[in-house]
Amino acid sequence: MKNYHTHTQRCYHAIDSEEEYILAAIKAGYTELGFSDHTPWRYHSSFHSSMRMEEDKLQNYVETLRALKEKYKGQISIKIGLECEYFPEYMEWLKETIDEYQLDYIILGNHYDETDETGIYFGRPLTKQQLTKYVDSCIEGMKTGLYSYLAHPDLAYYDNLDAFYKQEMMRLCQVAKDLDIPLEFNLLGYETCRQYPNETFFKIAKKMGNKVIIGTDAHESSALSNQRIYQLAYQYLNRLGIEPIEEIRFLR
């Protein structure tokens, strides 16, 4: 098993240290574990986000994982990444940060429009216009070529799963397919009964021929030991005719 959606206590809404996640993954039989804690951003204002690490903690995050990667070499492969939104005005900083820290990968977790300083949260009930903005933002992000996969692609909260919703999700899925970017089936959302995973969305993904990857979205180390929810997710996807993949494209 492999998982590339793992958080740590640094993001303020997860618990447990990097090493605790690694030990849980080894015990559960994972062969590769990728860490993708919420990225800091170098905001133009004095805004402080309560759901991501500060920029001055990033170096220690990377150094800690590199040391643990060496410590557990031969037992498990460790990849170092971040979960990032697509914030156009901050993308140059993100590219520089990826290169500076030689990150293995990043995933696109598109929580906010433009920036979480002032932008709307896409996981709240959306209007048609806001749903279109979500899809547009995901598409623009995927087209950068930076992201290894799209996390919780069905995060967008749109109550009426009507023809408009399906049209917009088809638009998203088509670009993901064209760019060979996998779509994540999110175990945290599945276990906690959020609006995602959305069966309507994954039926569209199946019809469009998208690749689907299971992401634990672990916010505590015990999530990596939950084989029951993992098997239920496999059964869910198999019922839809989807065989999830495990491999992703790395930046280096």
Whereabouts are the PLM-identified features?
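An N-terminally biased module of ancient metal coordination in phosphate/nucleic-acid-related enzymes
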Residues: 1-84, 93, 159-173, 180, ...
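Short amphipathic alpha-helices and their capping/turn segments at secondary-structure boundaries
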Residues: 18-31, 89-103, 134-144, 171-174, ...
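Short, hinge-like loop/turn segments at secondary-structure boundaries
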Residues: 51-53, 124-125, 201-203, 230-233
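Hydrophobic alpha-helical segments and helix pairs
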Residues: 76-121
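Domain-core and long-helix interface of multi-subunit machines
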Residues: 107-208
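Mid-to-C-terminal alpha-helical segments outside catalytic/metal-binding sites
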Residues: 227-252
